[in-house]
Regions:
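Acidic, Ser/Thr-rich peripheral helices and adjacent loops at domain boundaries
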Residues: 189-198
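Cofactor-pocket helix-loop regions in the catalytic cores of large enzyme subunits
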Residues: 1-181, 188, 203-228
């Protein structure tokens, strides 16, 4: 995750893609509810009408297998309507021209037979996400454990970069683990090869920081031994 779970509730737009937070991660679902209560727009894209879809401002029941076409069409709208963060693109991305040539072909109209989503709804989703002061993307196993998994994750990351929703508070690309116990264990550093926050054992400054916080002289500089 590029941003912390706590930051979700202070974003202006929550874009949920292939992820049922209320079932898999109730704590994350609670943060989404808090964000909604504070006025954030909530967008849910999922073939199933999941629990969070009940509070969503927009629910898009996109067809199975249409993830990449849907996201490319979103980015097509953002570019055609000039909603991209060009400064962020110029300073922090590469190969933008080739990317633009790719998504030009994915209009809301040309992808409707793939996604099953009306063009005007797709445009509304793109505008809502792109115009938000801050926006966070959440996705889960519904995206990753799928034959388009890699391509979909790349498209979601491209969407965040296209709108400058990286590298600042309350934004980001935030893939979650399969279940809440796994998420908590990993975030808290209960892994053999990372410290809390996925920080590296190999960095002396990080090691010193945790040694001081835990009140010990030092901690090992090498990862532990995995079970497998």
């Amino acid at each position: 995750m590029s941003n912390s779970i706590v930051e979700i509730e202070d974003t202006k737009c929550v874009f949920i893609f292939g992820y049922n937070a209320s079932t898999s991660h109730p704590i994350v679902a609670r943060r989404i509810n808090h964000a909604k209560a504070k006025g954030a727009k909530v967008i849910v894209c999922d073939p199933r009408k999941i629990e969070t879809a009940r509070i969503a401002d927009i629910y898009a029941p996109l067809a199975n297998g249409s993830n990449v076409a849907f996201l490319n069409a979103m980015m097509n709208v953002i570019l055609e309507e000039g909603l991209q963060d060009q400064k962020f693109i110029d300073e922090h991305t590469e190969n933008f021209d080739a990317f633009y040539e790719t998504v030009k072909a994915y209009t809301p109209e040309s992808t409707q037979h793939i996604t099953g989503i009306e063009p005007e709804m797709l445009r509304e989703i793109a505008r809502t996400y792109a115009k938000a002061e801050t926006a966070t993307i959440l996705w889960g196993m519904g995206v990753c454990q799928f034959r388009q998994g890699v391509e979909t994750v790349r498209a979601l990351a491209s969407l965040a970069m296209l709108t400058g929703n990286l590298g600042k508070p309350n934004v980001g690309v935030n893939p979650v683990r399969g279940q809440n116990n796994v998420q908590g264990a990993c975030d808290m550093g209960a892994l053999f090869n990372t410290l809390p926050g996925y920080q590296s054992f190999a960095d002396p400054e990080i090691n010193a920081k945790f040694a001081k916080a835990w009140g010990v002289p030092s901690i090992p500089s090498k990862p532990g031994v995995p079970l497998s």
